[in-house]
């Protein structure tokens, strides 16, 4: 909201001098990638940070922009689709080193680049329920021969075994659009 207030005078000047008709706020309405499952989704929605909706966002922004007489454009893509997608991957095998445990899965950085590219956090949960005492700290890595091919590092997680499925959550935004067939892997 502060950014909108700061740029509104510039938009008014541009409208007057150049006849602009649109004001694009862009995106930037984030989603929660971490912690949504700690206490349950329903309880999370009662937190203050969860109260930002398109409606509350509009109620905050429109009074500042409406006097400009411009068409307001919002790009809420991630808010709409971010948590609507999950990447399902299978644990191929486990590698236990002296200092680290690795869960090697069949999805790699070509499927979801965010963790490798800019350390984007995604909850990773087993598709089936696990007893809470069956946990391990592990790196979840893909099958691509790259040191950066990881979906999670030093993650406390259920101790899944070979053949079991994991869901990498919040993969709906940019997951597919940023995917590639790197290393001749199918998308």
What do the PLM-derived regions correspond to, one by one?
Residues 1-90:
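Active-site loop/helix belt of alpha/beta enzymes
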């Amino acid at each position: 909201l502060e950014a909108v207030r700061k740029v509104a005078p510039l938009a008014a000047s541009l409208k007057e001098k150049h006849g602009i008709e649109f004001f694009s706020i862009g995106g930037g309405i984030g989603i929660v990638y971490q912690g949504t499952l700690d206490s349950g989704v329903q309880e999370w929605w009662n937190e203050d940070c969860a109260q930002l909706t398109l409606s509350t966002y509009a109620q905050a922004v429109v009074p500042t922009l409406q006097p400009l007489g411009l068409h307001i454009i919002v790009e809420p893509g991630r808010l709409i689709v971010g948590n609507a997608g999950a990447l399902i991957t299978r644990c191929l095998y486990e590698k236990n080193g002296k200092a680290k445990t690795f869960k090697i899965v069949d999805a790699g950085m070509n499927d979801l680049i965010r963790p490798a590219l800019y350390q984007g956090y995604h909850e990773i949960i087993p598709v089936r329920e696990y007893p809470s005492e069956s946990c391990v700290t592990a790196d979840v890595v893909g099958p691509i021969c790259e040191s950066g091919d990881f979906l999670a590092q030093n993650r406390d997680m259920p101790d899944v075994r070979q053949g079991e499925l994991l869901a990498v959550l919040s993969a709906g935004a940019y997951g597919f659009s940023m995917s590639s067939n790197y290393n001749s892997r199918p998308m």
